[in-house]
């Protein structure tokens, strides 16, 4: 029987359907090389496992019991990688096309059909708790792509694309905040990225739970048409005894994700071109200090997160 897989790498998807169940993982890697230019020895295929362990090169594809068009994320770099790493992101990227949300907010935040969609997510979306909520803690909701991780550049491992100070930031935040990850992708990729970054099982902090694109809703905006957003009301509805508008902050590089809860959103600078910017990006380091300051407050609703740096500077100079 033939085997068909889709390789996700460098922001692109590559279909491979020329292999059989008798072919091996190494044969798959050779096919990937012909499409991407990444040598087999430089490829790391996330989620390709046999009996819970990464599949060796000599394992037959038939033994992996892959479903048709299984998606596999690859880490790996071409020999001439820096040319690709330094290339500008595509012009249609979400970060480029993001828009200032202020003028749209009043139109969508309290619209009845949007609140009804949130109510349906509260009722139907299944949250898989990794660790129980802690009474008295605030809530920090974090995006992944371009917030914690440069997902477009190519690299050998996720650690090369990890935003500087990530683990220090999460360790510090965990002292005052329960941490939730919310990404506009599927849970399969969220799991893979968090494991690759060493977040899932880190001994210094715990993730309360993770949300995927199925927890998002679509809203109609007057100027931009239909867009997908991350409504915090889904979390507040499911965990009303722990979290609310007064104790929640959300970091995302895409402002429109805050359309249903603009007061709680902090638009983080996107982390891109990791190989160029790794040495100078201090966003998470500074934001950990901001979180320390606002954790002293009982109510975040008087804050304007757009001016978080000004607020932090003022507090540090007192």
Curated annotation (Swiss-Prot):
Subcellular location: Nucleus
UniProt-annotated binding residues for Mg(2+): 143, 145, 253
Keywords: Hydrolase, Magnesium, Metal-binding, Nucleus, Protein phosphatase
Cofactor(s) required, per the database record: Mg(2+)
GO molecular function annotations of the record: metal ion binding; protein serine/threonine phosphatase activity
A Pfam family per the record: ubiquitin
Residue ranges of every copy of the FCP1 homology domain listed in the record: 133-294
Domain (Ubiquitin-like): residue spans on this chain: 3-81
One GO cellular component term: nucleus
Biological processes per GO annotation: regulation of proteasome assembly
Family annotation (InterPro entries): FCP1_dom, HAD-like_sf, HAD-SF_hydro_IIID, HAD_sf, Ubiquitin-like_dom, Ubiquitin-like_domsf, UBLCP1
PROSITE patterns (UniProt xref): FCP1 (PS50969), UBIQUITIN_2 (PS50053)
Catalytic activity annotation: O-phospho-L-seryl-[protein] + H2O = L-seryl-[protein] + phosphate; O-phospho-L-threonyl-[protein] + H2O = L-threonyl-[protein] + phosphate
Catalytic EC class: hydrolase
Main location: nucleus
Enzyme nomenclature, EC number: 3.1.3.16
Function: Dephosphorylates 26S nuclear proteasomes, thereby decreasing their proteolytic activity. Recruited to the 19S regulatory particle of the 26S proteasome where it dephosphorylates 19S component psmc2 which impairs psmc2 ATPase activity and disrupts 26S proteasome assembly. Has also been reported to stimulate the proteolytic activity of the 26S proteasome.
Record's comment describing the protein's domains: The Ubiquitin-like domain mediates interaction with proteasomes.
Record-given protein name: Ubiquitin-like domain-containing CTD phosphatase 1
């Amino acid at each position: 029987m033939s085997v068909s897989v889709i390789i996700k790498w460098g922001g692109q998807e590559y279909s491979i359907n020329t292999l059989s169940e008798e072919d091996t993982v190494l044969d798959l890697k050779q096919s990937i090389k012909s499409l991407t230019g990444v040598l087999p020895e430089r490829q790391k295929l996330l989620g390709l496992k046999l009996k819970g362990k990464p599949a060796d090169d000599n394992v037959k594809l038939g033994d992996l019991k892959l479903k048709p068009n299984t998606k596999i994320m690859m880490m790996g770099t071409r020999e001439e990688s820096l040319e690709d790493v330094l290339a500008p992101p595509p012009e249609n990227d979400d970060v480029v096309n993001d828009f200032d949300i202020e003028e749209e907010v009043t139109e969508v935040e309290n619209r009845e059909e949007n609140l009804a969609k949130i109510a349906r997510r509260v009722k139907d979306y299944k949250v898989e708790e990794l660790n129980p909520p802690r009474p008295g803690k605030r809530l920090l909701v974090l995006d992944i792509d371009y917030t914690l991780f440069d997902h477009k550049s190519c690299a050998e491992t996720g650690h090369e694309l990890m935003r500087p100070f990530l683990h220090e930031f999460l360790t510090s935040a965990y002292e005052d905040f329960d941490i939730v990850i919310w990404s506009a992708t599927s849970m399969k990729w969220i799991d893979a990225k968090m494991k690759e970054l060493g977040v899932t099982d880190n001994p210094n902090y715990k993730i309360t739970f993770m949300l995927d694109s199925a927890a998002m809703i679509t809203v109609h905006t007057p100027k931009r048409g239909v867009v997908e957003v991350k409504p915090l009301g889904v979390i507040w509805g499911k965990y009303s005894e722990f979290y609310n508008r007064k104790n929640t902050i959300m970091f995302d590089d895409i402002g429109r994700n805050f359309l249903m809860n603009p007061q709680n959103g902090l638009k983080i600078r996107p982390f891109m071109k990791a190989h160029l910017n790794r040495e100078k990006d201090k966003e998470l380091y500074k934001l950990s200090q901001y979180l320390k300051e606002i954790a002293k407050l009982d109510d975040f609703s008087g804050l304007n997160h757009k001016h978080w740096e000004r607020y932090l500077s003022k507090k540090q100079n007192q």
